[in-house]
From Swiss-Prot:
This is Probable alpha/beta-glucosidase agdC. It comes from Aspergillus flavus (strain ATCC 200026 / FGSC A1120 / IAM 13836 / NRRL 3357 / JCM 12722 / SRRC 167). Belongs to the glycosyl hydrolase 31 family. Glycans are attached at residues 171, 293, 373, 508, 574, 610, 744. The active site is at 422 (nucleophile), 425, 573 (proton donor). It holds the Pfam family Glyco_hydro_31_2nd. One of its GO terms (biological process) is polysaccharide catabolic process. Residues 447-463 have a biased composition (Pro residues). Glucosidase involved in the degradation of cellulosic biomass. Has both alpha- and beta-glucosidase activity. GO terms for cellular component: extracellular region. The gene is agdC. The lineage of its organism: Eukaryota, Fungi, Dikarya, Ascomycota, Pezizomycotina. Residues 432-476 are annotated as: Disordered. PROSITE patterns: GLYCOSYL_HYDROL_F31_1. It comes from the Eukaryota.
Amino acid sequence: MLGSLLLLAPLAGAAVIGSRADTKQCPGYKASNVQENDRSLTADLTLAGKPCNTYGTDLQNLKLLVEYQTDERLHVKIYDAEERVYQVPEKVTPRVDSGDGSSKDSALKFEYEEEPFSFTVKRDDEVLFDSSAENLIFQSQYLKLRTWLPENPYLYGLGEHTDPLRLSTTNYTRTFWNRDAYGTPANSNLYGTHPVYYDHRGESGTHGVFLLNSNGMDVFIDKTADGKQYLEYNALGGIFDFYFFTGSNPKEASIEYSKIVGLPAMQSYWTFGLHQCRYGYRDVYQVAEVVYNYTKAGIPLETMWTDIDYMDRRRVFSLDPDRFPLEKMRELVGYLHDHDQHYIVMVDPAVSVSDNGAFNRGLEQDVFLKTQNGSLYKGAVWPGVTAYPDWFHPDIQDYWNSEFSTFFNAETGVDIDGLWIDMNEASNFCPDPCTDPERYSSENNLPPAPPPVRSSSPRPLPGFPADFQPSSASRSQKRIVKAKVGLEGRDLLNPPYKIRNEAGSLSNKTINTGIVHAGEGYAEYDTHNLYGTMMSSSSREAMQYRRPEVRPLVITRSTYAGAGRDVGHWLGDNFSKWEHYRISIAEGLAFASMFQVPMVGADVCGFAGNTTEELCARWASLGAFFTFYRNHNEIGNIGQEFYVWPTVAESARKAIDIRYRLLDYIYTSFYKQSQTGEPFLQPVFYLYPEDENTFSIDLQFFYGDAILVSPVPDKGLTSVDAYFPDDIFYDWYTGTPVRGHGANITLSNIDITHIPLHIRGGSIIPIRSSSAMTTTELREKSFQLIIAPGLDGTASGSLYLDDGDSLEQKATLEVEFEYRKGVLHIDGKFELHASLVESVTLLGQGKGGSRARREDGTKKTIQTNLELSKPTEIKLE
């Protein structure tokens, strides 16, 4: 959340496209001392000629390590012989085991040329990666490697960005340097770094390439003058630490990636409800009024959020004593909990440099970043002059745990249920060089003035405590440099190679890259892209420290590869524009399916600027089919809570009704991803990997394996040209079969409160019999089963249930459904008591039998009142 403050400080230098000195004369390396066995290969790499020293000093001696880790994964690591060059710390990215794979059984084959050294990775004699396109460069502050690609490749990934799902292959640059990117502009570096790409090749399969490197980087995708396609890495440091992985289809490739960066965290049942937030709620009374208005409008609100407005002068771990006093905050949270609702607030990393508890305790424990002369490093953010936690400090977790357990104490503080962390790229409003953050804060009115104080709510809020009603109704540290932490003598502020950072210099609007962290002695230059993910890990641990037995929900803005192990992600400060509505689909799909961060969603209706009734109504429907569903907007703009407009309210009620009835399907699919890496939200080509027409689709998607979502894409439209692959589908609302033939079908007369949904043939979907106002109430509803037979007449599905919140489950329900030859087979593990299955609906039917309650030529529903307690068979035809 940056907002209008961007206008107050121009960028320190325009964005510069990665500088391109002539590197073609660089000699590359020669391989020698090659040692090879069935599981691995090692070699020495020696500079093959006179150093070119284009953007630093060429390293004379390197090492090569190749590991056949599994049949589907190959590890190729090129690093300095002395192992002094920085490598991503294992505490951030735990390394996978080297495995027990072998070259004989591996689907991937490694081949190399000795001089100049280059390597290829093949799958069934098909070249997937070929570094012979240019000589390898490994310098003190610059690494370069180029691989050939096939003509017109289908590439995906390389996030975070707001470009199309399928990446451009001409004159395209992806830059990795996390920044506070207000408005999430296209063709620029945004909040996160995910240096992995997927290359989908239809029938021959899908493979991915993950470069474990956290340094600033440009990735170029382009063609040579003679038309040859390539992809090129240009990094400011680190090593080449590649993981190649493959699958017969993109879903399998995504599963393989999860084995490298880690499986995503399972979320609590309630987190899939509707969330409401706004930057600019003036006091606790307005927050309470929003909660009341949702109830009054009959729109289920699961979780209420508060932005930095609750803080005393924007200081973390504080409450505005006049607008958000502790007593009232505890009453608000108590009301929410009494009504089976939840509460979340924001915590930023930057701590106000002032006489306050969080700063004083951090100063005493010496856990803030320091300059090289040992003084406190200071920036400027919302509270004014700030210090930044050093996530590498050995005592940082104790400090963070203590602040959380005190401020968010269930008995004496604000008893939050989840956490929102923001500004953790890290953001710094003070432009580079930030030599006087005090003056900058003063000149830019940081912290901003709060709104006038109110003593009570201006309107009655039935059900809230008496004091919520109108007055008429009631009243320098030494750093030790070790191995793998970075070469000495580098220019950490202005490296010779300039990546295309939209903010200009590396330190502009963020932490100074010359800072050296406590503990191991890592430089911010190398670890900048890890700051947000390290805050995420520490924050998740702090949340578990105060509530050890439950799953913590943490939503972050900044991410690095593997962040899904700890957190979910919202897509940042978007605009209330149709193009942002559309691009949120591609963004969400990339995070959920390719980056293994499945708890993801955009600010519904848009964050910045004034939304419109039509846009918000459409977005209320679309947002319901992401995993994370939150309405949020910016101070100074019109209110956009779903109850503000009648059509938006109706759209939200209809979409939430469907979402909540599907919540166990969502929960089951999410659980599966947390256990296996199999994606829940998926691009269309994930399910139809041999249909080339699907490879570029990013305005439709699958909500799990069973539901095709085809939103209306633009203003003023009441129709959508939806692509239906060669398969059978069923209209969600009517059950009418739709036979796809690999072509578009125009869906017409789509009301503003409606979103087209189709069930994929071959699916069995468990749904609740009706929706509810809270997820707690929802869990008491009975089940229904929808059977949508595929072209072969069969269908399958599953249901997973647990207590919905605990980290460790004492009992679960894990049921598999199969339909074949007119019989429904139910089997599985039945430890947990579940609601009855009151009915089974079979789609695609003509006249039904005597047990059919309803027959209309498209479906029949059979009353069952079945208890899910043992294996069962039900004859349906």
